[in-house]
Structures are given as structure tokens and as C-alpha cells.
């Protein structure tokens, strides 16, 4: 019984990598919708339909739990999928849940009124679609008061990373950080609201300065998943992993191997 990790492209591999290191005995299935990537420039309805199709495919492949390791999909599709009803014995969770738990210092199921939190000025770096959805701001507002969030849509960064052009990606990150700092000169914390961005975490940190706490998703999601699985020992397996893609399997395998710096072999979905 594998845990499913879904992303529109390769960014979710940062979440998978952290989860495998944290949970070496859990089986994982990674599903990349590479033929439709990137999601960040698509409209909300398109993102929902693509995500809905992929998640149902993963459930059919035996994944009782699917993590949307794509902030754009989480922002546009997660709540709608959950409200529409999930088949018995299946679950779908969003990747930004652990981020908001960490930022607000409260569990997702805590339904007490919003309260003051330590961090007051937060920079959010995400894809254009995630920024447009205002999902981070909405979920934060349910749990915290007095938090000022300044969002920066980071156009081009995902494309550069997917193409392996890290020089361009670094230049774009610096440009987007500069644009954010013109709007919010002194953020206390920064959310890397895309699973591709941990690969550029050092660039974000350097551009923001040492006094800004950077929240990156891989470790937080892995810790949250470990806590979830403590209550579900039946999901412990042999530590195997499978990789499927809607794109060109050979090309995606090559990119993924570069991405994680270890051999990754995808099969066609």
C-alpha cells in the first residue's frame, strides 16, 4: 500500500526525497503530470480537472493516501475535491498544510478562533496561479490574526528548473526577491510556496538575508507524514518506490536523475 506523491512536474521530488529519508520503510508512488506542466500558468478549472484525474488514477493504482506535492494543485483543487467527497478508505492531503501548521504553531484540526502568532510579516513566493488563488492567505486567516502576507508571483522559475537551467533560475529568483523587498522591505519569514523552490533555497536565503526565516516544504511535509503514519502501521512496507509520468518517460527520467542526483526511472502512466 503505497503513499502517492503527485505533482505537475518534477518539483514534488523534493517532497518525495525528504519523505523517503524520513520514512525509509514506506512504499511510495510518484506521479508526474509532465505532459501538462507547468500548472502555474493554467486557470483554476483546468488545474482542478487535471488534478482530479491524476488523483483518481493514483487511487486506482492502490494509493490510499495521496499528497498533492504541488502548491498550485493544492490551492486550486484540494478543498473542492474534499468537499465533493472522497471514496471510502481514501485520502488526499495538500502540501501546504504542514507549512501553515509550522507558521501558526497549531495543528490543522485545531478549530479554535484565530490568535496572535509570533511572525507578523510574511513573504510568499509562489507560482502565478497559487498567488492568484490566495489560498495561503485564506488558510492563514482562519488560524492567525495580524499577519501581513506579501505575495510575489515567480514567473519563469519552474520552467527554468524543469529545463535544468539553474543559472537562469538563480537570476529569476534574485529578481523576484528584489521585487518582493520593494513591497515589504523587512519580512520576518518567507514561504517557498512551490515544491520546486527548495532547490533554490540557498539563493532565496542569501537574497533575503540571514534574519529571514525561510520555510521550505520537504522536511515539514515529511515530518507531518511521519506523524500521520504513526497511527497507521498498516502503511509500513518495504521501502519501495515507483515513478510514473504522463510525459516522455525517458526524458523525464533523465531530468529526475539530474534533479535528485541519483538514478530515477519513470514509466508511462
Curated annotation (Swiss-Prot):
Cleavable signal peptide: none
Catalytic activity: L-glutamate = D-glutamate
Family: Belongs to the aspartate/glutamate racemases family.
GO MF term list: glutamate racemase activity
Active site per database record: 70 (proton donor/acceptor), 194 (proton donor/acceptor)
Origin superkingdom: Bacteria
Pathway assigned to this chain's UniProt record: Cell wall biogenesis; peptidoglycan biosynthesis
UniProt-recorded name of the protein: Glutamate racemase
Transmembrane segments: none
UniProt EC number: 5.1.1.3
Top-tier EC class: isomerase
Binding site for substrate: 7-8, 39-40, 71-72, 195-196
Function text: Provides the (R)-glutamate required for cell wall biosynthesis.
Keywords, ordered alphabetically: Cell shape, Cell wall biogenesis/degradation, Isomerase, Peptidoglycan synthesis
Amino acid at each position: 500500500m503505497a503513499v502517492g506523491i503527485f505533482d505537475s512536474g518534477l518539483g514534488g521530488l523534493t517532497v518525495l526525497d525528504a519523505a523517503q529519508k524520513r520514512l525509509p520503510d514506506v512504499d511510495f508512488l510518484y506521479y508526474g503530470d509532465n505532459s501538462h506542466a507547468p500548472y502555474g500558468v493554467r486557470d483554476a478549472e483546468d488545474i482542478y480537472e487535471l488534478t482530479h484525474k491524476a488523483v483518481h488514477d493514483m487511487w486506482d493504482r492502490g494509493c490510499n493516501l495521496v499528497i498533492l506535492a504541488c502548491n498550485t494543485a493544492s490551492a486550486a483543487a484540494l478543498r473542492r475535491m474534499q468537499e465533493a467527497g472522497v471514496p471510502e478508505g481514501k485520502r488526499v492531503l495538500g502540501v501546504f498544510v504542514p507549512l501553515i501548521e509550522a507558521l501558526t504553531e497549531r495543528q490543522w484540526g485545531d478549530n479554535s478562533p484565530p490568535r496572535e502568532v509570533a511572525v507578523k510579516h510574511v513573504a510568499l513566493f509562489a507560482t502565478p496561479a497559487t498567488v492568484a488563488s490566495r489560498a495561503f492567505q485564506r488558510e492563514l486567516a482562519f488560524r492567525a490574526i495580524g499577519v501581513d502576507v506579501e505575495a510575489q508571483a515567480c514567473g519563469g522559475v519552474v520552467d527554468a528548473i524543469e529545463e535544468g537551467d539553474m543559472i537562469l533560475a538563480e537570476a529569476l529568483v534574485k529578481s523576484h526577491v528584489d521585487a518582493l523587498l520593494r513591497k515589504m522591505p523587512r519580512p520576518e519569514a518567507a514561504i517557498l510556496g512551490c515544491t520546486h523552490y527548495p532547490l533554490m533555497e540557498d539563493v532565496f536565503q542569501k537574497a533575503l538575508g540571514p534574519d529571514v526565516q525561510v520555510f521550505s516544504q520537504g522536511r515539514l511535509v515529511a515530518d507531518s507524514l511521519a506523524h500521520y503514519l504513526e497511527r497507521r502501521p498498516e502503511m509500513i512496507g518495504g521501502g519501495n518506490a515507483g515513478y510514473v509520468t504522463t510525459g516522455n518517460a525517458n526524458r523525464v527520467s533523465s531530468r529526475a536523475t539530474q534533479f535528485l542526483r541519483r538514478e530515477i526511472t519513470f514509466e508511462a502512466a
